[in-house]
């Protein structure tokens, strides 16, 4: 109550911020007459003047009024559209690095031109991020006309572009693209071998369109670049056949829909073991024995695929592929795959080709990618419900920008039915009634399957309807553009079509493009255009009189924001409209989050078949349930971020070190330091500090140095000499190693040696980082169990991840030292050949013969990864293990599980000859 009183006197913080922006709007408006009097050439010259002001020390805030006024005047001349005052406010919110909440139809795309132009004047590049390639292309092509008029260049980054196109796009003043493409380009750049091959510039400023979708809904979805791992497709198919039978017995497993988890019961474990033994998949022991851990993992993923993932809801099957459906947008996510074998389990379930498993080479979440921008802003129609999350995770404030005209949409109370069948019949009956008034209808559903149920009901009533879901992805823009035509019925999965306005009466531009595509320019085409525009204008007036667009929601989403997005499709720019949600006790939200009380209440009311209850109390109860779910999801995203931050800190260190190597002309000093550290560690292992000379293991040291440096160093002889202490031994060994490498360098030639050291360092860093990512993934999967031992899983993860990171750095030094010592150099590469131009070096190795090295690229110009180093280099890893014979696998039984396999595959022993089961 006190808070309401304070707001009534002083206004909310949102109101106070808006008043500050309003004063600057007056400054911008005051410049309009002066700029309107300029010729096009004079207006365009203002861009050069503003750039000069910045060069002379002016700030962006200082030139903001003039820059915004110039953009508004240019927009009037290029598009015939003048920015409203509220759009100027939206532009200032974005320039200040905040999130502007602007209702659907308020012209967010045009608003973005204001801060984009202003910040692009610095020449450092501005990124405009959209949710799909279609919107990126559309906005870049349309708004690019305005930027071009003002003397700025525009680039676009979309899927399938060549490197040269991408580099040119990023070096433009303004770059449009999707969140996926920006993120993947960052990862790809950090796998390059020359700075000049990188496509992105340093990050400066980004505006994220539909910011809630990208930074909230997709926050937990990492971008992953992966390479092929071992092929286990047969095991997936075999396990799928077993689990397919198992799930027919409900007593075999327990499912928790709130947590989206499933596990075997005791009876289920016994049953699946019997089936696995009978099918020959299990040959010894029980399912939970250590050596059967791989089979257990496959069973768990197959069980998830059969019980938690539904076809046409979470995914569709097309062209022999399982394609993920984005739960928030309903769009296909072609190219995205579930990790940890889940996607392969779904492929086996659907009897399509089981693709090879992949190993992560590089990954990043959108949370950590976008937090790298020094200045970040966003715009959306719905952000206030997630304001706390934006503030806590991204340090972004949310400001609600008022609409240009008052919202006239009528939002009806929810109607709740007992069953889904009754609900869908009520929806179909309402649509039939609405169409008679000439009102267009947009029906929102949560899955492809449910959208097709409604379509079938409408077909029975002979009501034509357009279906907009992942299966009609290609026609999305056309369907949405015409969704406002009189009597048109459009059924959309979630927010498919987001980013395209639904205009009452239809879209004249879309009709002209489709109906007159083949008609040549001339009087006939002009007449046809005039006719279409007249028809659309008449239809617009008819639909307005009929009540505008009627939005029907067929289910409440877990997030209020998604429901608000659906409602927001109606009532754009002061248009009339209506919205209403139809629910049933069988809906996911009602069923999972407390429909028992509501169901009991409906029974007490004596609700009959086909009847609904409509009461504001229902809306409040649902909103309360949604808030609980939103809070839970926020906590989950925060928790994921805490773990990802550990990897993110390590990733930043590795990428910074990698860039330092790329930038260096000569890394010989780094390589020498690595060699010195590795040799020091080896000496310490065999000659402990303050040990007597007779306690030295000089034979072991000699063997270790032979394996590491591919040379016999007479340490045993030195150890017998009078007066040789530990320090003298270290000095002699280091001097001998340096001399060996100096001889190699002289033989190879100075230039060739610099190439080789740099290539080796970068490739080996990539290799150990890839292996480290796999270890972190495995650590993350099981770390939650530490809670049972009264230990904090996050602290345990941080501690062990740090230890693994240090071990990775040690492995890097070991491999670089060993490989450089093992190689023999042929002729140096030709002076004109640069090994980093289009691919990386290929190291061909063997054991125990000396190694030859050559620079090469693959047949298609692809990078050829570094093959694993020879087994000899790992001898030091087995220094404390007796009886190891590298040529006899039967002697490897005591090899440490995490040590490199003695066979030389480059994999850890536990993933190779030490594989369990």
UniProtKB/Swiss-Prot annotation:
GO terms for biological process: intracellular protein transmembrane transport; protein import; protein targeting; protein transport by the Sec complex. Pfam families: P-loop_SecA, SEC-C, SecA_DEAD, SecA_PP_bind, SecA_SW. GO terms for molecular function: ATP binding; metal ion binding; protein-exporting ATPase activity. It catalyses: ATP + H2O + cellular proteinSide 1 = ADP + phosphate + cellular proteinSide 2. May bind 1 zinc ion per subunit. Its main location: membrane. It is found in: Cell inner membrane; Cytoplasm. PROSITE patterns: SECA (PS01312), SECA_MOTOR_DEAD (PS51196). Belongs to the SecA family. PANTHER family: CHLOROPLAST PROTEIN-TRANSPORTING ATPASE, SECA INNER MEMBRANE COMPONENT OF SEC PROTEIN SECRETION SYSTEM. This is Protein translocase subunit SecA. It comes from Granulibacter bethesdensis (strain ATCC BAA-1260 / CGDNIH1). The lineage of its organism: Bacteria, Pseudomonadati, Pseudomonadota, Alphaproteobacteria, Acetobacterales.
């Amino acid at each position: 109550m006190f808070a309401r009183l304070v707001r009534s006197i002083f206004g909310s913080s949102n109101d106070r911020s808006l008043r500050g922006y309003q004063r600057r709007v007056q400054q911008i408006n005051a410049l309009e007459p002066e700029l309107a009097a300029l010729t096009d050439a004079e207006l365009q010259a203002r861009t050069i003047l503003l750039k000069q002001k910045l060069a002379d020390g002016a700030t962006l805030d200082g030139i903001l009024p003039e820059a915004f006024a110039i953009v508004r005047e240019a927009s009037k001349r290029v598009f015939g559209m003048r920015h409203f005052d509220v759009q100027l406010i939206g532009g200032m919110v974005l320039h200040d690095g905040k999130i502007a909440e602007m209702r659907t139809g308020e012209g967010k795309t045009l608003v973005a031109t204001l801060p984009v132009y202003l910040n692009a004047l610095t020449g450092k590049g501005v990124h405009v991020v959209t949710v799909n390639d279609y919107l990126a292309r559309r906005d870049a092509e349309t708004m690019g006309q305005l930027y071009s008029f003002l003397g700025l260049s525009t680039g676009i980054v979309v899927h399938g572009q060549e490197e040269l196109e991408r580099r040119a796009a990023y070096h433009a003043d303004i770059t449009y693209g999707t969140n996926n493409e920006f993120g993947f380009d960052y990862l790809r750049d950090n796998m390059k071998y020359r700075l000049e091959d990188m496509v992105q510039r340093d990050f400066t400023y980004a505006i994220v369109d539909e910011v809630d979708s990208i930074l909230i809904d997709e926050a937990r979805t990492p971008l992953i670049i992966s390479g092929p791992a071992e092929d286990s497709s047969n095991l997936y198919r075999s396990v799928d056949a077993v689990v397919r039978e198992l799930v027919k017995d409900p007593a075999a497993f327990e499912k928790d829909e709130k947590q989206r988890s499933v596990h075997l019961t005791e009876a289920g474990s016994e049953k699946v073991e019997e089936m696995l033994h009978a099918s020959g998949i299990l040959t010894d022991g029980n399912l939970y024995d250590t050596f059967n851990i791989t089979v257990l993992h496959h069973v768990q993923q197959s069980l998830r695929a059969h019980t938690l993932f539904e076809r046409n809801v979470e995914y569709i099957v097309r062209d022999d592929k399982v394609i993920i459906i984005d739960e928030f947008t309903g769009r296909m996510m072609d190219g995205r795959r579930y990790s940890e074998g889940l996607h392969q389990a779904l492929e086996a379930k659907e009897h399509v080709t089981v693709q090879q498993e992949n190993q992560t080479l590089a990954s990043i979440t959108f949370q950590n990618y976008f937090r790298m921008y020094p200045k970040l802003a966003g715009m959306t129609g719905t952000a206030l419900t997630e304001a706390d999350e934006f503030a806590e995770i991204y340090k972004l404030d949310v400001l609600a920008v008022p609409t240009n005209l008052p919202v006239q949409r009528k939002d009806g109370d929810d109607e709740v039915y007992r069953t889904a069948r009754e609900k869908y019949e009520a929806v179909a009956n309402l649509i039939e009634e609405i169409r008679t008034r000439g009102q267009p209808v947009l029906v929102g559903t949560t899955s492809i399957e449910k959208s097709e149920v409604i379509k079938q009901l409408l077909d029975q009533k002979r009501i034509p309807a357009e279906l907009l879901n992942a299966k009609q992805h290609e026609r999305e823009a056309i369907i949405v553009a015409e969704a406002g035509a009189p009597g048109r019925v459009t059924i959309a999965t979630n927010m498919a079509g987001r980013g395209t306005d639904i205009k009452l009466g239809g879209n004249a531009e879309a009709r002209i493009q489709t109906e007159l595509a083949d008609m040549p320019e001339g009087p006939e085409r002009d007449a046809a255009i005039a006719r279409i525009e007249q028809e659309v204008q008449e239809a617009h007036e008819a639909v307005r009189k009929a009540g505008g667009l009627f939005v029907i929601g067929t289910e409440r989403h877990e997030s209020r924001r998604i429901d608000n997005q659906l409602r927001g499709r109606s009532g754009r720019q002061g248009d009339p409209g209506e919205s209403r949600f139809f629910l049933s006790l069988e809906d996911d939200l009602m069923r999972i989050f407390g429909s028992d009380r509501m169901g009991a209440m409906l029974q007490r009311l004596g609700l009959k078949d086909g009847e609904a209850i409509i009461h504001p109390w229902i809306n409040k109860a649902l909103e309360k349930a949604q808030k609980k779910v939103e809070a839970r999801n926020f906590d989950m995203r925060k928790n994921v971020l805490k773990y990802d931050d550990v990897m993110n800190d390590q990733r930043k260190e590795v990428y910074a070190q990698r860039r330092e190597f790329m930038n260096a002309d000569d890394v010989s000093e780094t390589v020498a330091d690595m060699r010195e550290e590795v040799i020091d560690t080896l000496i310490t292992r065999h000659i402990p500090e303050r040990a007597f000379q007779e306690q030295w293991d000089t034979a072991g040291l000699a063997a270790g140095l032979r394996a590491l440096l591919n040379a016999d160093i007479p340490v045993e002889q030195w150890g017998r000499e009078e007066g040789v202490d530990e320090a003298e031994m270290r000095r002699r060994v280091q001097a001998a190693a340096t001399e060996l490498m100096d001889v190699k360098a002289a033989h190879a030639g100075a230039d060739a040696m610099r190439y080789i050291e740099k290539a080796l360092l970068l490739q080996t860093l990539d290799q150990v980082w890839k292996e480290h990512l796999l270890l972190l993934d495995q650590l993350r999967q099981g770390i939650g169990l530490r809670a049972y031992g009264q230990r904090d899983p996050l602290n345990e993860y941080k501690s062990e991840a740090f230890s693994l990171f240090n071990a990775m750095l040690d492995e890097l030094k070991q491999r670089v030292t060993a490989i450089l010592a093992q190689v023999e150099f042929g002729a140096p590469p030709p002076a004109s050949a640069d090994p980093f131009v289009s691919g990386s070096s290929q190291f061909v190795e063997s054991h125990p013969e000396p190694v030859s090295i050559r620079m090469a690229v693959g047949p298609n110009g692809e990078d050829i990864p570094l093959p694993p180093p020879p087994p000899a280099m790992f001898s030091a890893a087995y220094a404390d293990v007796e009886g190891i014979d590298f040529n006899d696998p039967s002697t490897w039984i005591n090899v440490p599980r995490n040590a490199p396999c003695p066979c030389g595959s480059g994999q850890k022993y536990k993933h190779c000859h030490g594989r369990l089961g």
